[in-house]
A protein has these predicted regions:
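Hydrophobic pocket/interface hotspot
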Residues: 22, 26, 97, 107, ...
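Long, hydrophobic N-terminal alpha-helical segment
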Residues: 1-48
């Protein structure tokens, strides 16, 4: 038996249609907050790629931490890309779970070998990758080198 690919949950990424309305609901109904807001523009400057192809995407995000786990609400601002497609197909909801991994390079290499690398970029000095683990785990895994900060995609 091999060792775990991840050893801790860091973030829950939720794709939403209306960021402000969702934040109000999370605050009013569930007591989750306070929130930090950011606009994230991804593209050539941070070597953003979806399925290996260069792309440009814009999102608004809101981030709150609950019990040591970051909740990231993502509102796609363009009609393309993995978040916009998820919103169109599913109507929103949990898109990914970010996990701590003991070996970022191996996790990414394995995903590349299995055609499961959905997204790769650099943001705020951290390398980020989305691994397509939906078939096996029912959700996309996000892995990173270093520690993601507020406004991490």
């Amino acid at each position: 038996m091999r060792g775990p690919v991840f050893d801790g949950t860091v973030q829950i990424g939720v794709v939403v249609r209306d960021l402000e309305a969702t934040v109000r609901r999370y605050e009013d109904d569930y007591g989750i907050g306070p929130w930090q807001f950011a606009r994230i523009d991804l593209g050539e400057a941070n070597d953003y790629r979806e399925y290996g192809e260069p792309a440009e995407r814009s999102n608004r995000v809101a981030i709150a931490t609950v019990g040591g786990v970051m909740w990231e609400l993502i509102e796609p601002l363009d009609g393309e890309g993995i978040w916009a497609r998820f919103l169109a197909e599913k109507g929103g909801g949990v898109h990914h779970v970010a996990v701590a991994t003991p070996d970022f390079g191996e996790a990414v290499a394995r995903a590349e070998r299995e055609d499961g690398l959905m997204l790769r970029c650099e943001h705020s000095g951290v390398d980020i990758a989305y691994l397509d683990t939906r078939r096996d785990l029912g959700v996309v895994l996000e892995v990173f080198s270093g520690t993601p900060g507020d406004g991490a995609p």
